[in-house]
């Protein structure tokens, strides 16, 4: 829940950048994640968490920017990269200046690129990307940019801690890595190989 207190503070701090959103009666956040298809459960749970936290931790405590309420607007990206960018544009066209997404680092990479280009071309309609769970390290390394704000630890940080625990288990001799065939899975595999080699003599067999 501390996450959403940070979001509220962030909205307050960044209000200077967004003239149109500041003067609106309600500060809106577009939640762009899967709400249909095989990943709908993940997106629906995330949406419920955002709505609950915004209502309980922000609106019921007086709102932001001098008492303005916050609202989460749900947009279904169907867990598809192209559809995600369509929904980002839908949000922008509706005057929404805060984009929240977290399921799929591949999609997050596409959104951060779009937001960067949009803000360069539209300095009077700048958008901030609130990345709440896409943990590809590239998003805050090679692709680090001012308009992308990540709340979660990246895959390198998480794997560093996980391999500390693994290193303490003397009975583990071999390990097989299974992961997704896109940016997130590849980042996790690379971090696992790196830290296991540094901390253990475990053989990675696949």
List each model region and its residues.
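Short, well-structured alpha-helical segments in soluble
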Residues: 74, 78-97, 114-117, 164-168
């Amino acid at each position: 829940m501390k996450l959403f207190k940070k979001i509220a503070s962030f909205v307050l701090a960044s209000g200077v950048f967004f003239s149109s959103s500041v003067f609106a009666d309600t500060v809106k956040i577009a939640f762009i994640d899967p709400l249909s298809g095989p990943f709908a459960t993940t997106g629906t749970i995330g949406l419920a968490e955002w709505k609950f936290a915004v209502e309980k931790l922000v609106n019921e405590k007086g709102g932001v920017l001098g008492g303005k309420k916050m609202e989460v607007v749900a947009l279904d990206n169907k867990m598809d990269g192209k559809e995600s960018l369509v929904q980002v544009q839908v949000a922008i066209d509706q005057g929404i200046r805060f984009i929240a997404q977290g399921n799929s680092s591949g999609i997050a990479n596409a959104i951060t690129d779009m937001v960067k280009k949009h803000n360069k071309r539209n300095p009077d309609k700048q958008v901030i990307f609130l990345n709440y769970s896409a943990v590809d390290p590239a998003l805050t390394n090679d692709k680090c940019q001012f308009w992308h704000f990540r709340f979660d630890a990246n895959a390198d940080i998480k794997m560093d801690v996980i391999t500390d625990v693994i290193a303490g288990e003397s009975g583990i001799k071999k390990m097989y890595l299974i992961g997704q065939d896109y940016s997130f899975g590849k980042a996790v595999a690379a971090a696992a190989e790196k830290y296991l080699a540094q901390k253990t003599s475990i053989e990675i067999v696949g």
